[in-house]
Curated annotation (Swiss-Prot):
This is GMP synthase [glutamine-hydrolyzing]. It comes from Cryptococcus neoformans var. grubii serotype A (strain H99 / ATCC 208821 / CBS 10515 / FGSC 9487) (Filobasidiella neoformans var. grubii). Keywords: ATP-binding, Cytoplasm, Glutamine amidotransferase, GMP biosynthesis, Ligase, Magnesium, Nucleotide-binding, Purine biosynthesis. It catalyses: XMP + L-glutamine + ATP + H2O = GMP + L-glutamate + AMP + diphosphate + 2 H(+). Homodimer. Also forms a small population of homotetramers. GO terms for cellular component: cytosol.
């Protein structure tokens, strides 16, 4: 959904990100409250926004607010006339702007803390904790993660919560809807934190809680129909993953047979993927699907390339080229139909569907100060600048769990909705080194065994994503009486709510043992299996 359109349909909370590892959780908590919100870098100029938020939340940050390179908010934030909530660093930024003092404290607070809410007796000042049930001792358990803290109140601010070591844990302006909390209400370790956020967005900001997948479907279908008109045609990039499948189903619901689902076999798909996807989309969903075998073209362009960013760019650019060529064929067919049927004919092919999600957008933002781009996502930063087709991305504002919920509402079978994600660049970013047919075959076989064993153990639906990575190293092994010198694969499985953070999955030892045994015995060229136990952060889900 386009930015201007979505803000005309939903009240929006703006989250300004200062580089905190928890920033995305603020977004998640708002969405869980059926409140639409959007995260932008802290460097965002308010004057450049084409819409006005109902409220603004300033995130935490790894920086000290007085450090020479510390990020700072646009001063216009405080003249916009909307409620503001500062979290951790956000509180300190509010204090800095309004004349308070922030210092490094001798007692750093990391972990659980108990705050005492201070009632001022004034409704607006007490609004942040209004109606929240305190614990038996009268306090409220929260999660702290800060070294600096507010040591003197800015003029016209009052204390609304404190701890023994932090007298200004939460503050409020005397007459304006500006609040700050030193703790992190967005994390699960603050049990009542979601209620604090709810008090701000609903009670203080007055946001209408209309954001839900039930409301999203008719509005997005109406938007798609308006964009495409009565005759416009769309080609859809589908891979068989949940994102593109849900996007394709939504598009098919909106414009019917004017939507053309196209799958590009780029040579770096999972084993027998093209056949499986064709069956799933045509039999289960009734979508008209064309499969284009462009594997020779992709592999020729990937020859000799090891750098993951170059792989992404090559695959993204080649992907668009193939789609444009197919669009030209469809356009020629449309022109022929127009000549034969006149006004009964369909319109031009103008749009390219992609299943871009909100985490893709977040991770592809390059902040000028506190953060750096993690990687260029295939769906966001790897497209041709001179692309002739226009992108249509109906899922761009959604998190993965929202997409799955949307799929279920669209009556997509559970075995499709629950499928693990697969990256746009495919196995090319799971092969750490040059992509060759031999390496692809090894990885396809190992990955197929891995997923088969996970399903057999009844663990597939407990895992958010699982895959095998082929490493660019060899190890000595023994097969019978012979010495081997073959490749190493890493198996990875993670659990996550939204793919912004993830924990490695704890397998029963016997399952890992069987996975390792089967791969080393059945996959020629592999003699060692390792298990990746890295969480996100510090790692990413994919290796490249």
């Amino acid at each position: 959904m386009a930015t201007e359109e979505i803000h005309s349909l939903y009240d929006t909370i703006l989250i300004l990100d200062f580089g905190s590892q928890y920033s995305h959780l603020i977004t998640r908590r708002c969405r869980e409250l059926n409140v639409y919100c959007e995260m932008l870098p802290c460097t965002q100029k308010i004057s450049e926004l084409s819409w006005k938020p109902k409220g603004i939340i300033l995130s935490g940050s790894p920086y000290s607010v007085y450090a020479p390179d510390a990020p700072h908010v646009d001063p216009d934030v405080f003249t916009l006339g909307v409620p503001i909530l500062g979290i951790c660093y956000g509180l300190q930024e509010i204090a800095r702007v309004h004349g308070g003092t922030v210092d490094a404290h001798t007692h750093r607070e990391y972990g659980y803390a108990k705050i005492e809410v201070v009632k001022t007796g004034k409704k607006d000042q007490d609004a942040l904790f209004e109606g929240i049930e305190m614990e038996a001792d009268g306090g409220l358990q929260v999660w702290m993660s800060h070294g600096d803290q507010l040591t003197s109140l800015p003029p016209n601010f009052v204390t609304i919560a404190s701890t023994p070591t932090s007298p200004f844990t939460s503050v409020a302006h005397e007459s304006k809807p500006i609040y700050g909390v030193q703790f992190h209400p967005e994390v699960s370790h603050s049990p009542r934190g979601k209620e604090v956020i709810a008090a701000f967005v609903k009670n203080v900001c007055g946001v209408r809680d209309g954001w839900s997948m039930e409301s999203f479907i008719p509005k997005e279908i109406a938007r798609i129909r308006q964009i495409c008109g009565e005759k416009g045609q769309v080609i859809g990039a589908v891979s068989g993953g949940v994102d593109s499948t849900v996007a394709a189903k939504l598009m098919h619901e909106a414009i019917g047979d004017r939507f053309h689902a196209i799958m590009v076999d780029n040579g770096v798909l999972r084993k027998d993927e093209a056949k499986k996807v064709h069956k799933m989309l045509t039999v289960d969903l009734g979508v008209n699907l064309t499969v284009i075998d462009a594997s020779e073209l992709f592999l020729a362009r990937l020859k000799g390339v090891e750098d993951p960013e170059r792989k992404r760019k090559i695959i993204g650019n080649t992907f668009i080229e193939v789609f444009e060529a197919e669009a030209a064929k469809l356009e020629a067919a449309a022109e022929k139909e127009l000549a034969e049927k006149g006004g009964e004919a369909k319109g031009k092919i103008e749009w390219l569907l992609q299943g871009t999600l909100y985490p893709d957008v977040i991770e592809s933002i390059s902040f000028k100060g506190p953060s750096a781009t993690i990687k260029t996502h295939h769906n966001v930063g790897g497209l041709l600048e001179d692309m002739k087709l226009k992108l249509i991305e109906p899922l761009r504002e959604l998190f993965k769990d929202e997409v799955r919920a949307l799929g279920r509402l669209l009556n997509i079978p559970e075995h499709l909705v629950g499928r693990h994600p697969f990256p746009g660049p495919g196995l090319a970013i799971r092969i750490l080194g040059e992509v060759t047919r031999e390496q692809i075959a090894i990885l396809q076989h190992a990955d197929d065994i891995y997923i088969e064993e996970i399903r057999a153990a009844g663990l597939y639906d407990q895992i958010s994503q699982a895959f095998v990575a082929l490493l660019p190293v060899k190890a000595v092994g023994v097969a019978g009486d012979a010495r081997t010198y073959d490749q190493v694969v890493a198996v990875r499985a993670v659990s996550t709510e939204d793919f912004m953070t993830a924990d490695w999955f704890v397998f029963p030892p016997q399952v890992l043992k069987r996975i390792s045994s089967r791969i080393t015995n059945e996959v020629k060229g592999v003699n060692r299996v390792v298990y990746d136990i890295t969480s996100k952060p510090p790692g990413t889900v994919e290796w490249l």
